[in-house]
Structure formats: structure tokens, C-alpha cells
Amino acid sequence: MSSLQATNTGSAHATSAWMRWLTHRWSVQALALLGVLMVLPVINSGLTLDDFLHWSTLHEGARVANHTGSPWGLFHFLAGNVADNQALKATGEMVWWAANDLRTLFWRPLTEWTHWLDHGLWPQSPALMHLHSLLWYGALILLLARLYQRLDTGSQVRARLAVLIFICSSLHLSAVAWIAARNQLVAACCAVLCIGAFHVWRTRPSPRHGWLAVAMFGLALMSAEAGLATLGYLVAHALVFGAPHQPHQASSVWRERVAPLLPFLLIMVIWRVAYNALGYGSSGSGFYIDPASDPVRFAGNIMLRLPTLLLAQVFGVPSATLNLLAPAQQALYATAAAVALALCWWVARIYGVWASPVARFLGIGGVLALVPMCASETTDRLLLNAEIGFSWLLAMLFARALGQHRPRRSWDTLPAKILIGLIVFVHLVVMPIQTVAYAALRKPLLTPTSVLDPLELPDGRQDPDARLVLLNPPLAALTFYYPSVRRYHGMVNPASMHALANSFHDLSLTVVDAHTLELRSAGNKSFIDAFSRDVVTRPFKIGEAIQAGPIQAVVATLSPHGTPRSVRFRFSSPITSSPWRFYVWTDAGYVPYTLPAPGQTTSLPAPDLSRALMRQLKGEERRQAQSSE
């Protein structure tokens, strides 16, 4: 009995120490500093993917696509013009299976100015560009702390615990660590300012804050499409709070709840009309779906993706898991996620969380913020705006459990506390470790495939007419970035670099004749990615011939999901002639490959990614040791 009392006393002292620290006058600033320090190693991770396109646009004057309505067109990747896309296929920058009308154009003018500042003041310093993003992240943490304190005037500890949960989260790390993803941080800062100003405007007569909320919403939309998630919180606020500064007036539902939203709805409509009129948006890709042009399919995706994103938010299960599953398995996964979330709702209910209007507001707002995110394939990066609400919700749940708040029924206590303990362990133990580890390992994890692989291919100075054929790159769509990466590092590109398949699965290669080879994926699996072509609206057909400059791809067989399983590639000149150089990707990167004789078949086994990763990590350790000597 004394041992149990001692344990309880020790636990109470530890909890009390945490409470005192969270109520310290400098705890908010300390939390912001801690959040930045946890991810500080990313400043050494250099440029990645879109970062190289931004460099090319701002320093070489390159234009990936028309940039009407945008200062530089930094987020204009593919304009959907068939002739332009065919030209990109001819050089290999677009994979052969990409939709001819593939379009990915995003309108983010406010964020573009931040990148222009980077390349104007410190163009040769990716570290300072990362530091710039970290300043936005620190500002977001401080703004969140202020918002929570404004909403939750009854508990300083709970508000700051919410900030602690937010900075420990690994869900938004890619938005912080990737320079090109800064748009999400800028939009989130504007969103938090908008929500806070809207709350002040609706809880006490303050027209100035109303105008501020409207302005911040507009800036959020000009920062990133993710700014649209802000409207979810405003709708939730109107539903939960109405017009609390007029509690004794007989106001209609229209006046209390709907009318305050009209300025924001008007801005959203104007933004969307301008967005469409200027040609922005995405089409032809399986990664993005336009809700306006295909609302039925978007609704179906909400059923699958919303539970998946919420499961990632609460339990930390990677949301990209859904993308790895077959359609039938996706439905089962989403159902299981919904059941797990229902259990969480039940636990929050028995602990009285939903009795708080702030909890209902932030909970509904967090869910609504994820609805527009369901237009894209699931990735944890989409959860940043939802974390605004869920960080506080989790803080309240943890505080209730720590504070010995008694559930409504005693028999609920044990299973509820087990579930809460699991969530606490995920958010305050696992996620901080993931955050620090990924920040430290981001460079060795991403640099090999995004930077080193394209640099391993021969310099065009040696043979400017060479046409490189990459039989099985790890991610074929990354060849879109290869020319910019190589130019950034002072290399000259060859005439073309064509990727034929992804190395997701084992492949077999057959040389059919002097001009033709065939690639076949093992089993019923496909070797293409979903990003470059939406097979629902642009299905493949057996016998379909696709021209990619000097190479013609003919679909021979399809997988059960309608994607190519075997393809014949016919080359404009004999495959043994001088322009063609064949490469395979192995655990050690790209290596030259000698084709078998006509009529023979050979295998291209899928690389062991775990072995490749360990080799990359060891190689990075050696490079760091050499640089320090």
C-alpha cells in the first residue's frame, strides 16, 4: 500500500512540475524555440525536387508553363497543353504514360514573393532558405499559442499543452523541412490570424477584427490552396457560437450564423472564379481530383480519405498507407479507421470533452478543414491545418485524464484510459522521436534519389547527342526534375533521359528485335505511378500506342486495375546504335546495362530498398567524416 502511495505521490509531483513549467511566463517562447530546435537539422538538407525548379525559373529564366496572374510562375508545372507535354515526353522530362493533357498549375502569389526574397538575398545558401521557413514555423507556433489562450481563457496549462503537442507532431514535418512546401506554413499563419480575428469579432463588437479576418482569409488563399481549410473553422465557429455578444437579442439563425460568413464565402467564390479563369488547377492526374468538375468522385474519396487522414491525426498511422492498398482493401481500411475514430469520440464523450463549446468548435473545424484535402492523395503534409484544432482537443483530453476527471460510468475507466495512454504515447513519445530523427536524416534519406541519382548519369559534354534510357528508376516521375538538378550542379544534359518503368516490382526484359524491347511486371502488378495519369478518366487500352519522341510505347497487357502490366517499346533507330545508353537502378544507384541478344529475356529484380537505404546512410556518414577532416 505504501509503495502505491509513493508511486501516486511521485506521479503527482511530476505532473505538478509540468504544470508549473507550462504556466511560466516564458513557456510560450520556450515552446516556440524548442519546436524550431527539434527540426533545426533540416537547414543542412539542401534543395529538393520543386526547389530546383524554383532556382531554374528565378536564375535561368526557365518557364515550365505560362504564369498569367502570378509573379514568376513558381508553382506552374504543366499547363495541360498537348504540344508542350509532347515536347517534354520527347526529352524524357515527362514519363511516356503521362496524360497528354496533364495539367498542374497552382496559384500561390504571396508565397512566391517569399521564394523571390530567398533567391534575391541568399541565392547560393539553401541553409538560409531553410532558416527562412523555420522563422515562419516559429511564427506559426507563437500565433497558435495566442489563439489557444484567446479561445481557452479558463486554462493556461491546457492551451500551452496544446502547443507542446503541436511542436511534437511529426505530421507536418515535411511542410517545415521542404522549402517548396513553405506555402503551407504561410497559409497556416494567415489561417490562425483569421480564426483568432473572427473569434474576437463574433464574441465582442469589434469591426476592426472583422476586417482583419477577411483580409487574412484572402491572404491565406493567395498563399496556398490549403488556405481554403480556414473556412472550415469559420463555419464551425458559426455553428457552435453563433453570435455570443448578442445573447439576449432575438436574432434569426440567418443573422447569427450565416450572415457573418457571407464576406468569406464571397471571397472564396471570387478566388475560385479567378483561379479557373486564369487556367489554374489540376487535371489528368490520378493524384488530384477537381471537386468542381467531378463532385461524385470527390464525395467517394471523402468517404475513403477523411477517416484515413483523421486516423493519422489521432494515432499517427501514416496516411499514405491508403495509397498502397487495392481499392477493395482501401474500403476496409477506411472502415476500420472510422471504427477507431468512433472509439476516440466515445472516450472524449465519457470524459466530458464535448461539453466544452471550444472543443466542439475546434473538433468540427478540424474535420471540415480536411474535406478539401480529400481532393489529393493522402499524405501527412495535408494535416497541418487540421492540427490547429486537434492539438487543442488532444490537450483537453490529456488534461482531463491527468486531472483525475471521473468518467460518467466507472466501468468505462480502464478501456478509456488505455486508449488515452496509447494516444499520449504516440503524440508525446513516438512523434517527437520521429520528428528529431527525420530532421537529422532527411538529407541522407532524400538526397540519393532526388539529387545523387541524376548526377550519376553521364555529363552531356561527353556526348551531347546521347539518349539515356532508364529501365527501372525508383520513381520514374522524378525525371521531371533531373535536368534542373543537373544544371544546378553545373552539368550539361544529354539529348534526352527516358524512364521506362518504376522499380516497384520485379521486371522481365525481352529484346524482341533490333528496334524493340518489352518490359513486363511480375504477377498482375503495374509499373507506373498514379500521379501522371488518371486511369479512371483516361483509361489505358490494349494496343494503345504512345509516342515519346524517338520512342513509341505500345501497351501489350493490362493489370486488373487497368494499368499497363507489359509494354513494348519501339526505338526510332537500332537499340545497339550509338545514341542509346541503357541504365538500370540497383541498390548502389544507376549502373550501365548491356541488353541481351534479340529473342532473349532477362530479369530486372526490384532493388532491396532497405539495403539501399543503409548504404546511403553509411555513405552519408563517410562523406560527413571526410568533410570534417
Indicate residue ranges for each PLM-predicted region.
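Intrinsically disordered, polar/acidic, low-complexity terminal segments
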Residues: F52-L58, P71, F77-L78, A98, ...
